[in-house]
Amino acid sequence: MCRDHISQLQPLKICDGWSVVLNNLNSEKGMQEKCELLILQNEKRKAFIKVSYENHQFHIKVAGLNRDKIYEDESFDEIEQLLEELEYQIWSVGSGVLEGVQPLTQQIPDFLRLKIPAGWTVDYITLKDTDPKTLEASDDAWLFDFNQDLLQISHKAKNLLLDVGWYPEGDPTGNYGIELIKNEDWENPLEDIMCTELKELIAQLDHIFMREMKNEYQSAGSNTCLSTEDNMRRCLVY
């Protein structure tokens, strides 16, 4: 069931600071009933994004965590239209546009789209959608896109930290390194994986997320994540 859930999730370009409160956003066309599909929360920007489905339309709402301000409230017939607007809002709000910072005028970076289930927060991401197997050894991308700080995602309720980097930095003969850390114990990672292909990296990340959803990394207190999600949801406007 968890494997099916991960495989059906819609991958998204996401930036630093967003926490996934709820994620049932997939590409299925057969939804008939009213349902919530996605809730993202950004503590730094004091905002959340909610995606829902009702009356045969997708709805996206961008609102403040203080409950008294709705910034965007739009509806779309097709999921492709929704995804375009959703990624724009993720990056626009994440860049600080709600606080009077310069509006997002540049193109959204070509970051790797990820399937992130509920409970995880993106601490930082610079991971590009660039397959190292397609690059020449002299390509400048090795200098700018392949370093030790590509992705860090944390699951605070379960004290998990997922870290991705390229080792050695900028080396065409290197590899992706994936580590899953619990309770800040870097000496004894729960996962320590190396791979050289982008598609393999994606598969490994999906597998780790699937195992987390099945509580395979948690020795006790399997309900912690649910109670944390409930607490986060209480802050939101429905």
For each of these PLM feature ranges, what is it?
Residues A47-I49, L160-L162, E191:
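Short beta-strand segments
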Residues D149-L151, L162, Y176:
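Residue-level detector of short, conserved catalytic/binding motifs and their immediate flanks
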Residues M1-K46, N66-D77, G96-A157:
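Negatively charged, low-complexity tracts enriched in Asp/Glu with abundant Ser/Thr
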Residues K50-E54, K156, G165-E169:
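Short beta-strand micro-motifs enriched in acidic
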Residues S154, G165, E179-I181:
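Residues in well-ordered beta-strands of folded domains
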Residues K61-R113, G174-Y238:
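Mixed-charge, Lys/Arg-enriched low-complexity segments
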Residues Q57, N159, D171-T173:
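Coil-to-beta-strand transition motifs
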Residues V20, L40, I49-V51, I60, ...:
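Hydrophobic beta-strand residues in large extracellular and virion-surface proteins
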